[in-house]
């Protein structure tokens, strides 16, 4: 079993919780049973752990340091961390990423998983591996561009 920590911006906001719900559902439905050997190894039994779903209801009941320490404790027992879109603007996500890097926990960005899944599906459907890889790379570039644009819009809103 591969334990995968899901790092997603939260800040106690309902819209972030709703987005995290969608991400976790996609990961569990599509990636939990989808046998992608990379980036998580050959084990097809992925367990996705979301601190928002475990501790989110306590966001306004404990101080920030206590909450982030719980998150890091959870992360410390994981094999990998998935960084969800918007992590760049989140203090908590950045702390989790730094911890993961310092402790040799595999880091992957959600858009990389989406591209990997599309490549695998294309190859399984009979597409040439090289063509599927090019299509996956193009998809990854498009997803990253959209994530960057979303981040810029979010930053512009917070300035205004």
Language-model-detected regions and their locations in the chain:
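Conserved catalytic or regulatory cores that recognize and/or transform ribose-phosphate-containing ligands
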Residues: 1-160
């Amino acid at each position: 079993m591969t334990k995968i920590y899901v790092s997603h911006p939260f800040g106690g906001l309902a819209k972030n919780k709703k987005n995290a719900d969608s991400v976790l559902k996609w990961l569990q439905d599509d990636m939990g049973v989808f046998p992608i050997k990379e980036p998580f190894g050959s084990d097809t039994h992925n367990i996705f752990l979301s601190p928002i779903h475990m501790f989110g209801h306590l966001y306004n009941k404990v101080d920030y340091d206590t909450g982030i320490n719980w998150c890091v404790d959870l992360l410390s027992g994981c094999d990998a961390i998935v960084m969800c879109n918007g992590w760049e603007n989140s203090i908590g996500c950045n702390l989790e990423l730094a911890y993961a890097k310092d402790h040799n926990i595999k880091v992957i960005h959600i858009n990389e998983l989406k591209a990997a899944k599309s490549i695998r599906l294309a190859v399984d459907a009979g597409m040439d591996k090289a063509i599927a890889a090019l299509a996956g790379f193009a998809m990854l570039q498009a997803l990253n561009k959209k994530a960057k644009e979303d981040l810029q819009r979010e930053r512009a809103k917070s300035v205004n």
